[in-house]
Amino acid sequence: MQFKKQLLVIFFAYFLVVNESEAFFGTLFKLGSKLIPGVMKLFSKKKERSLMKRELKNLYDPYQRSVEMERLLKELPLY
């Protein structure tokens, strides 16, 4: 009888420890799965923004516009 009580106590103690650790690591995993993609997006957005700024500078560069205009005018048929 004493042995059964000891096994029961050990089982419940093990169950509580495993259950608590599962909840703890589950919470850590949830937080990690939310934070890691957010951090990755943050760095990728900075790169995208810098590329977009560079493209806008190239778009509004006067020399670049004149080169584009010349290319388009050369494509037009002459009548």
Swiss-Prot record:
Chief localisation class: secreted
| GO biological process: one example | innate immune response
Instruction: Please give the superkingdom of this protein's source.
Output: Eukaryota
Q: Where in the cell is it found?
A: Secreted; Target cell membrane
Q: Keywords of this protein's UniProt record, alphabetized?
A: Antibiotic, Antimicrobial, Chemotaxis, Cleavage on pair of basic residues, Fungicide, Immunity, Innate immunity, Membrane, Secreted, Signal, Target cell membrane, Target membrane
Indicate yes or no for the key word Endoplasmic reticulum.
Answer: no
Q: In which tissues is it expressed?
A: Expressed by the venom gland.
Residue span(s) of the pro-peptide: 50-79
Would you indicate the residue range of the signal peptide? 1-23
GO cellular component terms attached to this protein's record: extracellular region; membrane; other organism cell membrane
| Keyword Ribonucleoprotein assigned | no
Function, as annotated, reads: Antimicrobial peptide. Shows antibacterial activity against all M.massiliense bacterial strains tested. Has antifungal activity against Candida spp. and two Cryptococcus neoformans strains with MICs values ranging from 6.25 to 200 uM. Also shows an inhibitory activity on C.albicans biofilms at high concentrations. Exhibits chemotactic activity for monocytes, neutrophils, and eosinophils. Shows low cytotoxic activity and has weak hemolytic activity on human erythrocytes. In vivo, treatment of infected mice with M.massiliense reduces the bacterial load in the liver, lung, and spleen.
Family stated for the protein in its record? Belongs to the non-disulfide-bridged peptide (NDBP) superfamily. Medium-length antimicrobial peptide (group 3) family.
Q: What is this protein called?
A: Antimicrobial peptide ToAP2
> In which organism is this protein found?
Tityus obscurus
Q: What is the lineage of its organism?
A: Eukaryota, Metazoa, Ecdysozoa, Arthropoda, Chelicerata
